[in-house]
Amino acid sequence: MKKIFALLTAAALLLSGCSVGVIGGEDGPTQVYVGGGDGGGALRELDVVLDWYPNALHAFLYVAMEKGYYAQEGLKVNIRFPSNANDAISLVAAGRADIGLYYQQDVIQARANQAVPVKSIGAVVQGPLNIVLSLAEKDISSPADLTGKNVGYAGTELSEAIVRSIMANVGADYSGVQLVDVGFDLMSSMTTGSVDATIGCLVNHEVPQMEEEGFDVSWFDLDDYGVPTYYEGVFLANDTAVEQNGETLSAFLRASARGFADLKAEPEEALAILLANQNEENFPLSETVERSSMAVLLPMMETAEAAFLSQSDECWRENIGWMLEQGLIDRAPELDEVRVNIPF
């Protein structure tokens, strides 16, 4: 899935007697979940901006809402879809949303280069989902196979730095790769033969989607070739919220972790809840693709070494160091500038 978005519209959905609606606003549509709680007391509203339309990555949120876990913590969570690529970080930084789901390396870059006052409060995915993907017929299984090839990407500095790193890792010449800015068209650029491979596709989404469409594909992971392991998704809050609303953020993380525990225990139930909350107009979901996506995500959202939402100083240090080395950031931010570990 891409990290650049169009304006969104949505229709009302009905889920197990609990209504889910979408309302417009200058900061993009909001999915308001009403019901599924204990019905007692006033709830504190939390606006949560997703990185994309609802998909398997967000299933734990919808499970937690459906089962009333946020309400039991005194929270009413409003899910908001981004209207622009950086809404999850920009709206949170400006105090126009409470929590965003965004990307670790973008958080580092925003803090280091622009002093954007946000930090990660929890890692949703413990490793990279981004891959180098190609049709199997292209015979590409490592960076060395990219020499002399056209590689599609979304035109970002980060992707260029990743390609430089993986080529250097295998002793190959970066200048031998022809990077082609294909914008949003990562999959179609491969299937039409415009490029030989792409960087920017996600192993949990584009791989099962292309396989469902009948394509044989191959891919390799970036962190096997010199790119540090990074968190594909992190929850963000702004500095003021971290300083003043720690208990609220802790309650959100606690309820989210309960939703994830249920996702692990009953993935088919979680899939049904997700499908009932999909944005059919703008991003209809395939049950087969989302089931495959969940199977990929579950062991990456929590590992034997890292609990769901945990984040390590080592991961942050390695990514800061790599980004500084690649010229992606102007300075190395302190760890406390980019992450906080909130007990929950």
Put a short name on every predicted segment:
Residues 38-183, 187-192, 196-204, 219-220, ...:
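Short, glycine-/small- and polar/acidic-enriched structural segments
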